[in-house]
A protein has these predicted regions:
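A conserved beta-strand-loop-helix scaffold within acyl/acetyltransferase catalytic domains
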Residues: 28-110
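N-terminal accessory/interface modules of nucleic-acid-binding and processing proteins
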Residues: 6-40
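Charge-rich, low-complexity intrinsically disordered segments
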Residues: 175-226
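Acyl-donor binding region in acyl/amide transferases
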Residues: 79, 85-178
């Protein structure tokens, strides 16, 4: 793995980062046993989506804090578990888990959510929240576990975690312009570059404009905690 420090050091680093956050509500959410809202935004037709945060709980092998995306009916669409560690004297985010919905949630629900978010997949929405958290704190790099490196890769864990869809991490990180550093780890960009509207086909510009407005709303919602 990328980081050789023991688990105790990793935990200390994460809570040092949380202590550095100026807004107590955000710090409380990231350490709470129960989900607490950290961002909201309006999707298509004015529907409000919420990103909650909590301590990692049962996902503690994947990280220390978890982000959760829920729709206006409180359906869980995606979750992301991460920690903040130290590498070469700098604070870095490490994504240890990224899950879709429980199996009781149909793929049609995810398609509708993606359409409501103007083409942004639920996992991509959570990544935007993470990018904003990194940008507004002292994080200097973002790393992510690969398919090979995930703690639940073993068959017995996949069977025990069968309530969730398991999509390929490697494919998703590649879609974010990530770079594979080893069999176990990817490095992701600190921000996703946006195309200018001039680069986009005219028939798609209105949809992209709405997508950018949604991303701006997510940014403003996270920024309100800093």
């Amino acid at each position: 793995m990328l980081f050789r420090s023991d688990r105790a050091d990793a935990i200390v680093s994460h809570y040092y980062w949380i202590d550095s956050l100026k807004e107590s509500g955000l710090a409380l959410a990231l350490t709470s046993p129960q989900e607490k809202p950290v961002a909201q935004f309006h999707a298509k037709d004015g529907v409000i989506y919420t990103v909650n945060a909590s301590s990692a709980g049962k996902a503690e092998r994947e990280g220390e804090s978890t982000l959760w995306l829920r729709d206006n009916e409180d359906t869980l669409l995606a979750s992301l578990t991460f920690s903040v560690a130290r590498s070469n004297g700098q604070q870095v985010m490490v994504i240890g888990g990224l899950q879709g919905p429980r199996r009781s949630v149909t793929r049609d629900v995810i398609k509708l959510a993606t359409r409501a978010c103007h083409g942004l997949f639920p996992k991509r929405v959570l990544m935007e929240v993470l990018f904003q958290l990194a940008a507004r704190s002292s994080v200097r790099a973002i790393f992510a576990v690969s398919d090979e490196g995930h703690v639940f890769r073993a068959l017995r864990y996949r069977l025990s975690k069968g309530r969730h869809f398991h999509a390929s991490y490697d494919e998703f990180w590649a879609s974010l312009d990530g770079k594979k550093l080893s069999a176990f780890c990817w490095q992701l960009p600190l921000q996703m570059a946006r195309k200018s509207l001039e680069e986009i086909a005219s028939k798609k510009r209105a949809e992209y404009r709405r997508r950018f407005e949604l991303l701006d709303e997510i940014e403003a919602s996270v920024k309100s905690h800093f």
